[in-house]
Each structure stands twice: as C-alpha cells, then as structure tokens.
C-alpha cells in the first residue's frame, strides 16, 4: 500500500517493513511513492540489514543532514566495538561504551584521568563515568543503548537523539496553490473595470479586462515551495445610470472565466506536482460617484459575485479532481482632489480603502492513496488601503494619464489545509506591500484603454507580479 493510513507523524528509527534475519545483498526499491498525510517516505537499509520506511533528507539533498543510506554510516562515522556505530567519536573496545571520549578496556580504567570505582559501578556491560550512568544517563547493556538516549539495537542505526528530517509530498503545495488561487481569482477593485476620468451623465460603460498574475512563496514551514500563474477574463456592462441630488449612481452586471496553474516542489524531494483551477464567475456591481462627469470628490463602489471552480492535482503518484464554489462581496470607498497648479499638468490624489468578504466551500477530497484533504474554515476577509496619484492634463481630462498606486494589502485568505487531519499552512503573509504603475487614455471619443503593471511582496519569500489590460466603451 502507498498510504500509511495515518497523519504521517515524525519517525525516529523509521517503520520496519522488511526483516532480513541475516545478511543479504538484495536492494529494495518502492514501486511508487509512499505518502502518509502530508509526508513522503522512502526505503532505507539500516546496519542490521533490515529495511525501514523513513521520511528524511539524504546527503545528495543536504550534506549537513544525517543519513543511513544502506552502508550503515551513523552520524559520527565512528565504530562502537560491537560493530555498532557510535556518535560520540569514541571507541568501545570491549563492547562497552564510555561517552566521555575514554575507552573502558575491561579493567575498568576511565582514561580521562579518572579511576572507575570511585563509588561508581562498572558492571561489565556497563555503568561508568564517575558515578554517572554511561552515555548521558543511558545504559549500555551489550546490545546496546548508546548516544544520548537513543537505542542502538545491536547494529541498528543510532539517530543521535535527533528526529530524522521530514520530507513533504509535493502534492501538498499544489493543493495549497489551488486553494489560494480559487479564493483570489475574481477579486477586483473599481479601477480594474472603471478607471474612466470623464463620463456624460447618461453614458453606460461596457468593459472587458484581461489580467495575468504570477506569484511564488514557500509554505509548510519552508518544506514546500510553489508558484502559480493566473489568467482572468472578465466582461461587464452598465445597465443603469441614474443622476441623484448629490452625485450619480451606476449599476451593471459581469461574468468571467479564469485559469490558474501551479507548480510545486518539496524540499529534499526529487518529485514535483502540478495544480490547475478552472473558474467561472457571475456578479453585479454598483458605484456612486459624487461628481457626475469627472472622477472627483468621493465615491462608493460595491460588487457581489458567485464563482465555481474545477480543480486538479497531478503528479507521478495520482491524478486528482475535486470541485469548489463560493461567493465574494466588496465595499470600496475613495476621495479624489486636484493639487492646484498653474502648469498644464498637475496631480490628482485619491486615497482608497476596500474590504472584501470571501466564502469558498471546497469539497473534502480523499485521493487515490487514501490521503484526506480537508479545509479548516470557509470564509475570510481581505483589506486594502492605498493612495492613487494620477498626472493629468487640466484642460483635457480625457488625455492620457499616467498614474502610480501604493497599497497595503491585509489578509491572506484561508491559508491552511489539513492532510489526514494534520494542518499545513500556505504561509502567505498576512501583510503585503503592492506597487502599481499604469496609464489610461482614449483610443477615440468613446473607447478608453488602460494598461497596468504591478508588484507585490511579503514575508516567506512571497512575491507576486501582474499585468492588466482594460478596454472601456461608453455608449
């Protein structure tokens, strides 16, 4: 079986699966990866000749990590005279180990300059070290307990008291990448669909944008890393424009489709995995603008949308499919004013704030090897606080306007998944900084194009880069 049936907790001496009962030159390999929960296991032969399943790094991955690679090297590379490896770098000539770096030669002299028998018992097998139990308080009883409290079972690997490094399955990163991509795929702000600087009162706006985003980060306590590329097409149109006593109210509908692809690697693991999300979206939006023609003064923008997703995780272990669905709602406010200037161009400053509530219900999934992938919660809140500065021409507000926006992004979304009830975190930083550079201008009297590039950074090696192209047609 390729599923250990548990959460995949840390092992010290490994799980014995083949007992040789003597010497054998046979070399065993796994027919397919063995995974328990989030962790991946491999076969290692110990110095007793038996084979064990362990989740640990190998020398080729990290030279500083300990290994038992079938040649029976054990941490210190030093011989315990019984044929057993001893981490202390000390030779035990009679089968009895004295951890102080001194040989106990059977005559029970402690070569560190201390004579055994100063009230200390050396009973042949043996307790030693000046009244202290041999080997850090551990009995070496011939077969033998050794090295800091770890059992050296007559030729078995002694792990030096340190748990073997665990190796995560790369599928973990693919599941985490899919989960975050589905949550964020259709989240947007007003500028994504409506950056117009001039509109007649009765103008309706039909719009379409395409955006791409690439992001990468480490997850699972730095045991897995992944990158995700997302592409989204969103189309919408106003169906109402209503002047009010103060300002103007516009409303419309929208729909969209998107795809996200994730590539995941696990530390100390030669395998990789891929994730894929195909998403679809329908929603409504409404905007109140204080100035009826120009984007000046205050505004309030709201939208709500329902989305559904088809998710896949593929690797050389399994191909998995599962579904998710959810909805999101946003409230955004801002206020723009012009810096007075006698120059032809001047700056328009627009502070913005936005809060998005997101709910995503991902079905609990059990893969072909029995690993259960479940969510911990369904809802999350995203926040944004920023300032947009546009450099515009005072006598012709429809002329091309370059702009820069700086945002503080708050909230990482639902960041965790459970694999056989063991939680693994996406490690997406809760706080991130974002910089956007863009330009907006008219192609003709009724059509406007906007181009934007963005970068986003945070802890845990998190980085994201994006591009956005928007077409608006007023009619």
Regions found by a protein language model. Name each.
Residues 200, 241-245, 290-294, 337-343, ...:
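Outer-membrane beta-barrel strand-turn architecture
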Residues 243, 280-283, 372-475:
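Outer membrane beta-barrel transmembrane domains
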Residues 322-338, 342-416:
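Detector for outer-membrane/organellar transmembrane beta-barrel domains
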Residues 9-10, 225, 344-345, 398, ...:
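Short glycine/proline-enriched turns and hinge-like loops at secondary-structure junctions
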Residues 206-208, 249-253, 282, 296-304, ...:
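Transmembrane beta-strands of outer-membrane beta-barrel proteins
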Residues 156-341, 453-454, 459:
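Outer membrane beta-barrel translocator domains of Type V secretion systems
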Residues 224-228, 268-274, 316-323, 366-373, ...:
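Flexible, surface-exposed loop regions and adjacent strand-edge segments
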Residues 3-246:
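Outer-membrane translocation/initiation segment of Type V secreted surface proteins
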């Amino acid at each position: 079986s390729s599923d250990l049936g548990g959460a995949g907790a840390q092992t010290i001496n490994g799980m014995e699966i083949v007992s040789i009962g003597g010497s054998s030159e046979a070399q065993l390999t796994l027919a397919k990866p063995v995974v328990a929960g989030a962790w991946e296991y491999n076969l290692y032969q110990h110095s007793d000749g038996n084979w064990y399943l362990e989740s640990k790094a190998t020398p080729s991955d990290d030279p500083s990590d300990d290994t038992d690679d079938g040649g029976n090297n054990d941490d210190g590379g030093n011989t315990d005279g019984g044929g057993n490896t001893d981490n202390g770098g000390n030779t035990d000539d009679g089968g009895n180990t004295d951890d102080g770096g001194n040989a106990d030669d059977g005559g029970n002299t402690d070569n560190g300059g201390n004579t055994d028998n100063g009230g200390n018992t050396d009973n042949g097998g043996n307790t030693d070290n000046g009244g202290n139990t041999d080997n850090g308080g551990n009995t070496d009883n011939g077969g033998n307990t050794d090295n800091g409290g770890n059992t050296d079972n007559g030729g078995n690997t002694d792990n030096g008291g340190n748990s073997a490094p665990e190796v995560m399955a790369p599928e973990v990163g693919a599941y985490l990448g899919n989960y975050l991509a589905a949550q964020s795929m259709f989240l947007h702000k007003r500028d994504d669909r409506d950056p117009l600087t001039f509109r007649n009162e009765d103008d309706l706006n039909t719009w379409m944008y395409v955006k791409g985003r690439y992001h990468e980060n480490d997850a699972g306590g730095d045991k897995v890393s992944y990158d995700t590329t997302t592409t989204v097409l969103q189309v919408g149109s106003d169906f109402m424009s209503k002047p009010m006593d103060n300002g103007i109210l516009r409303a419309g509908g929208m729909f969209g489709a998107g795809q996200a692809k994730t590539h995941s690697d696990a530390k100390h693991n030669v395998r990789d995995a891929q994730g894929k999300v195909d998403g679809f979206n329908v929603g409504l939006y409404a905007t109140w603008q204080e100035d009826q023609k120009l984007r000046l003064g205050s505004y309030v923008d709201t939208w709500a949308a329902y989305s559904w997703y088809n998710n896949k995780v593929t690797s050389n272990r399994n191909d998995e499919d599962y579904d998710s669905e959810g909805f999101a709602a946003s409230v955004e406010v801002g206020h723009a004013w012009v810096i007075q200037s006698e120059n032809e161009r001047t700056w328009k400053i627009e502070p913005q704030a936005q809060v998005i509530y997101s709910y995503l219900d991902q079905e609990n999934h059990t893969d072909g090897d029995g690993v259960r992938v479940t969510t911990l919660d369904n809802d999350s809140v995203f926040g944004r606080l920023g300032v947009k500065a546009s450099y515009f021409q005072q006598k012709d507000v429809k002329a091309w306007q370059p702009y820069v926006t700086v945002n503080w992004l708050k909230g990482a979304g639902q960041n965790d998944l459970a694999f056989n009830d063991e939680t693994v975190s996406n490690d997406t930083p809760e706080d991130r900084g974002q910089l956007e550079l863009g330009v907006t201008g008219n192609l003709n009297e009724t059509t406007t194009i906007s181009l934007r590039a963005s970068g986003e950074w945070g802890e845990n090696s998190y980085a994201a880069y994006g591009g956005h192209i928007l077409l608006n047609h007023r009619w």
